[in-house]
Regions:
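Short helix-loop capping/hinge motifs at secondary-structure junctions, enriched
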Residues: 6-11, 156
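Rossmann-like dinucleotide-binding domain that binds NAD(P)(H)
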Residues: 9-80, 90-92, 166-170
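C-terminal helix-rich "cap/oligomerization" subdomain common to oxidoreductases
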Residues: 57, 144-182
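Active-site loop of classical SDR/Rossmann-like NAD(P)-dependent oxidoreductases
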Residues: 113, 118-126, 133-147, 163
Length: 182
């Protein structure tokens, strides 16, 4: 894991756009499932467009933009650390690629000659064995979640070790903190 290995340094910022649930999943991915916001500012009324800024300890922030349908939006997630950046490419809620950028000199490429950071792209192809009629973009990528559930059921597990009940409840608590202002 690029975040856990500290390859991008300490995560300082998450920027994401889509709906509150998916953007908040990116926040818990970046800051850790146990991170709790110390302040939440929300603008906009559901189901229209809006946004939220979540502040976490140690001067860390999440800047989330909630879109309204129909509209054209980037749906890209950026996770910025002290040493580099991760981009979950479009569509970020179920991406097929991510890009890691780590400049040779930190804290910023702007400190020198403004040369773009070297990047490394990782591609995750969609399963070709799944046909989903009238599917949304990359929807067949969710097959990986379904396979994880099947593995847990076959092993007689009551919850998935990668995202357990406590993780789900924590994410729902943060989601409630955002939605109560929308």
């Amino acid at each position: 894991n690029v975040i856990e290995s500290n390859a991008i340094g300490d995560v300082l910022m998450v920027q994401a756009d889509f709906d509150p649930f998916y953007t908040l999943q990116a926040v818990t991915l970046a800051f850790g499932i146990d991170a709790k916001p110390i302040d939440i500012k929300v603008s906009g009324k559901a189901p229209g467009p809006g946004g939220a800024i979540l502040e976490f300890e140690n001067n860390r922030f999440a800047n989330l933009t909630f879109i309204a349908y129909p509209s054209e939006f980037p749906e890209v997630t950026e996770i910025t650390g002290t040493k580099g950046r991760i981009t979950l490419e479009q569509p970020a809620h179920c991406p097929t690629s991510l890009t890691v950028r780590i400049p040779p000199i930190t804290p910023s490429r702007y400190m020198r000659d403004n040369t773009p950071s070297p990047s490394q792209r990782f591609d995750y192809p969609l399963p070709s064995s799944v046909s989903v009629p009238r599917a949304f973009v990359n929807q067949q990528g969710f097959i990986y979640m379904i396979e994880a559930i099947h593995r847990c059921l076959a092993a007689r597990l009551l919850e998935c070790p990668q995202f357990n009940k406590q993780d789900s409840l924590h994410l729902m608590e943060i989601l409630h903190g955002v939605l109560k202002y929308r």
